[in-house]
Amino acid sequence: MIERSYFMPRIIDSNDKNLIGDKVKALRKAKKMSQQTLSDRLETMAIYVCRGSISRIEDKSRTVTDIELYGISKVLETPIESFFES
């Protein structure tokens, strides 16, 4: 059996599980929107991300799916590309 140390680490093994958490938080706060409001607006798009998950996305302890990112970008009225700009 090959030891795990011979494999490349998976992204979920790191402390930072997403690249966009800081940007989501900044954009949400700039719009004076609560985490619950963001969650509620995503739900109207049939994208179910609870308030606690929004918190974990923002502190980078939860991954984000492509559909979730799409919804977040629509609710925050910003292009998806902007989440990856420095």
Residue ranges with predicted function:
Residues G52, D59-G71:
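Short, basic-rich loop-to-helix N-cap that marks the start of a DNA-contacting helix
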Residues K23, S34, L38, T65-E68, ...:
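Residues that mark the N-terminal boundary/hinge immediately upstream of a DNA-recognition element
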